């Protein structure tokens, strides 16, 4: 269970009052303290660049007559552990009566497609893995009169070849055309920090038929990990006085979004969430493109802001209570925009590191002010490129130094860039391929029922399809009792997060770890594409490496993994739920039946050329299928271990949580781009201490807490807790935003209470959280490091370089710029 910091509590910590008033048609956010912005009329005039909301359909698709394979493929997916054997996973809204003709009110039909089959509804269910669904929209215009209420574990997918349109009626009532977390009498009905496993992609949200004074929201999206928005268009009225907004997020622990286009509106987006990775968002003609109401850390990559008054407004709370913790903006452009960044930060603002900001490779075109502070212009603009500029605290490597100036940006290895920008690639949807290019694993003999051993059937279909067909994993849970080998040339896509589940004695020997899924064989060259799936284990599998990546892929066309996650325990069928693995804070006895994995993901020394996007490696801290999301104790030895000697690795929007020895470990590797990364220390630590469940194994570069923790701060137990990030003998590890969190000490949350209000304990959950080791480690550089619950923020060869008390933010502690040297 994520720390569910209620928004009112968090903003109380930073003395920022935010009123959220719900009406039948809108949510209006007002802040008691906000730096004055320019008016709508102060947009930089440029009729040549002002884009019409009808001139562009999508950032990544164009109209086509090609049938989308997902619409026409035989749908035989199942929910393996749903007691209703006829439960329907794929739902075409037209099969439920929607017309999509732009005239008929399709609200009831769409909501029925969402809810049919006893699914997990907000307010009546905290979470469920047994009621997954794809709600599919064929091409058309769907008129709705009330909000579509989103259910847990839902993928809302439109036809990418002909984006379907959602439009409100004139009397529309609700918070968002799609409401991702409905409000009730006690606030959000889902705990926003626990809303996992959902997507929205390939839709147009069109508000332009509604008067601009009607402050409708297109999408309400409080959300957590393993969620994504992709390839959507938001059309809003851009007339003077418009009150419309595209996306509203006020809570959660995200998250990823990419390839979104916004036209008009008072706010393109309003963002408030612990952390997020945002890539390739484009804004036209908004008053404010991005309005930050709060965060801990956000990373923006590839923004394009055009003809707006303000690009990013991160001034909420004013100088006495900044509620935006930190923002990193890279490879982005602001064109014909009055102010690119509006901030409340200065040398005396509070909290001291609130409003930390990093700009790297940011281009301005006819944008007069790059950064405006509380009393005026801080950084001028015009038409220029900002190589590196920031504000906050820096350690280079010593500190803290409070800075607000230009700096030398990180040196980017050429292997990671294209035309000097970092390489990116969106999740493939294969929309141009005919249905004949796909092969279903269930049609090929696999069952996916969570009981049958599907190892042989899956290996057979993968081998036969490699380099020829896209392998479609119909929804289901595919039990394997030995390693599943993904061959070179494979393209694999899941349905509603199809699960591969390792089970049995083959994976049970902690002294002889075996991969559940092996991508290629050691030293093999080639490319694999893999998306929309989960890898898990069942029962005690102490020797399981869930994903082992072996492939050598070229930097120019790397292999990719998109929306592929590991989930260890905490779900129906795992035999690692509340009944088997309850918390034991009063006992030091380890339940060996709950030692569930050796490692989540291993990138082997010979591997290279791997692009990860929106990947969450999670050992469950709670039982998703329990009515109360009750906490559990499950043990996994290691998180993500990158040992690639050649490197050329991209980690875009990744998170690793609740492993014993470490979450991220980079050892003897190089040339890694990572941003944003997020971790959580296992809640059960230090009972037992790190390394008790997971003995140190020669050859794995494991940290040895039994020696490294003696004498550290005089508190052995608090030291012997898993590293959030550990770097050993590596170079050019470039981190663009990080949230390394330690919320608990043996399930006691008071250790992470903030310094303020009075009575808070500060960061007292563990002693250290980020370690750099070895004389050969160099250019370990990081923007916007945010930690929670750790006394030391950065440790170099056992010595602390930065303490949290020197870098206090609202709830977290922040260092804007760190260079190891």
Predicted features by range, described:
Residues 460, 464-465, 470-479, 483, ...:
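C-terminal, well-structured subdomains that either form a transmembrane helix-short loop-helix hairpin
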Residues 146, 153-154, 264-267, 274-290, ...:
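Internal alpha-helical scaffold/solenoid segments in large eukaryotic proteins
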Residues 242-243, 626-627, 631-641, 651:
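Active-site-adjacent structural elements in folded domains
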Residues 449-464, 477-487, 491-495:
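Glycine-rich phosphate/ribose-binding loops and adjacent secondary-structure elements
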Residues 137-141, 153, 161, 475-476, ...:
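Tight coil/turn sites that cap or link beta-strands
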Residues 143-145, 478-482, 487, 673, ...:
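Flexible loop/turn segments at secondary-structure boundaries
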Residues 729, 736-739, 752-753, 757-761, ...:
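Long, ordered, helix-rich scaffold segments
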Residues 2-134, 147, 152, 159-210, ...:
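Extracellular "leader-to-stem" segments immediately downstream of a signal peptide or signal-anchor
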């Amino acid at each position: 269970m994520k720390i569910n910091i209620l928004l009112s509590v968090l903003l109380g910590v930073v003395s920022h009052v935010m009123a959220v008033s719900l009406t039948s048609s809108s949510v209006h956010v007002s802040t008691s303290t906000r730096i004055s912005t320019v008016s709508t009329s102060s947009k930089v005039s440029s009729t040549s660049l002002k884009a019409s909301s009808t001139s562009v359909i999508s950032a990544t698709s164009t109209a086509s007559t090609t049938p989308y394979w997902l619409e026409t493929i035989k749908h035989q997916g199942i929910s393996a552990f749903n007691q209703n054997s006829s439960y329907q996973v794929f739902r075409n809204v037209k099969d439920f009566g929607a017309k999509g003709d732009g005239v008929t009110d399709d609200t009831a039909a769409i909501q029925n497609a969402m809810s049919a089959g006893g699914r997990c509804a907000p307010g009546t269910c905290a979470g469920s893995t047994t009621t997954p669904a794809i709600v599919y929209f064929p091409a058309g215009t769907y008129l709705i009169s009330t909000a579509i209420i989103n259910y847990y574990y839902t993928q809302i997918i439109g036809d990418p070849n002909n984006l379907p349109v959602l439009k409100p009626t004139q009397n529309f009532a609700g918070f968002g055309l799609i409401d991702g977390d409905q409000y009730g009498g006690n606030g959000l009905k889902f705990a926003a920090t626990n809303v996992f496993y959902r997507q929205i992609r390939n839709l147009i949200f069109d508000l332009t038929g509604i008067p601009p004074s009607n402050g409708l929201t297109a999408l309400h999206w409080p959300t957590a990990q393993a969620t994504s928005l992709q390839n959507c268009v938001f059309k809003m009225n851009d007339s003077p006085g418009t009150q419309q907004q595209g996306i509203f997020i006020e809570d959660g622990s995200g998250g990823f979004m990419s390839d979104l286009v916004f036209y008009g509106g008072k706010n393109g987006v309003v963002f408030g969430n612990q952390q997020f990775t945002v890539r390739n968002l484009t804004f036209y003609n908004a008053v404010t493109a991005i309005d930050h109401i709060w965060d801990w850390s956000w990373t923006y990559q590839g923004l394009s802001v055009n003809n707006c008054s303000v690009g990013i407004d991160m001034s909420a709370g004013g100088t006495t209570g900044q509620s935006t913790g930190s923002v990193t903006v890279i490879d982005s452009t602001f064109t014909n925009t009055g102010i690119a960044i509006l901030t409340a930060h200065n040398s005396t603002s509070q909290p001291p590191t609130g409003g930390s900001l990093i700009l790297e490779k940011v281009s301005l075109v006819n944008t007069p002010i790059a950064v405006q502070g509380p009393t005026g212009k801080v950084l001028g603009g015009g038409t220029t490129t900002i190589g590196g500029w920031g504000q906050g605290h820096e350690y280079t490597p010593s500190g803290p130094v409070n800075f607000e100036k230009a700096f030398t940006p990180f040196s980017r290895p050429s292997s990671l860039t294209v035309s000097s920008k970092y390489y990116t690639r969106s999740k493939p949807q294969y929309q141009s391929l005919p249905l004949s290019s796909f092969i279903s694993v269930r049609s090929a003999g696999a069952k996916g029922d969570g009981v049958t051993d599907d190892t042989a059937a899956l290996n057979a279909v993968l081998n036969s399809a490699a380099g020829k067909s896209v392998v479609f994993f119909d929804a289901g849970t595919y039990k394997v009792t030995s390693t599943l080998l993904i061959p070179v040339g494979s393209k694999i896509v899941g349905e509603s997060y199809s699960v591969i589940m390792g089970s049995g004695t083959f994976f049970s020997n902690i002294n002889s770890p075996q991969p559940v899924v092996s991508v290629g064989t050691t030293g093999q060259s080639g490319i694999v594409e893999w998306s929309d799936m989960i890898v898990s284990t069942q029962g005690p599998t102490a020797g399981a490496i869930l994903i082992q990546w072996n492939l050598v892929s070229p930097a120019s066309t790397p292999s990719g993994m998109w929306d592929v996650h590991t989930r260890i325990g905490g779900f129906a069928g795992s035999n690692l739920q509340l009944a088997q693995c309850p918390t034991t804070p009063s006992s030091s006895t380890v339940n060996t039946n709950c030692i569930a994995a050796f490692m989540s993901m291993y990138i082997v020394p010979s591997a290279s050329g791997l692009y990860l996007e929106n990947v969450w490696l999670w050992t469950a801290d709670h039982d998703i299928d329990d009515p109360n999301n009750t906490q559990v104790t499950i043990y996994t030895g290691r998180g993500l271990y990158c040992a690639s000697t050649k490197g050329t690795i991209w980690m875009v929007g990744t998170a690793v949580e609740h492993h014993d020895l470490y979450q991220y470990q980079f050892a003897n590797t190089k040339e890694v781009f990572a941003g944003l990364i997020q971790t959580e220390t296992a809640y059960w630590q230090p009972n037992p201490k790190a390394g008790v469940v997971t003995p140190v194994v020669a050859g794995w570069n494991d940290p040895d807490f039994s020696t490294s923790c003696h004498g550290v701060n005089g508190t052995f137990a608090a030291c012997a807790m898993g590293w959030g990030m550990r770097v050993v003998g590596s170079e050019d590890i470039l981190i663009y935003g990080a949230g390394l969190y330690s919320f608990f000490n043996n399930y006691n949350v008071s250790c992470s209470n903030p310094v303020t209000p009075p009575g808070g304990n500060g960061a007292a959950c563990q002693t250290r959280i980020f370690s750099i080791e070895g004389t050969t480690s160099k250019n370990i550089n990081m923007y916007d490091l945010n930690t929670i619950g750790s006394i030391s923020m950065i440790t170099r060869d056992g010595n602390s370089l930065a303490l949290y008390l020197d870098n206090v933010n609202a709830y977290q502690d922040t260092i804007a710029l760190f260079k190891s040297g």
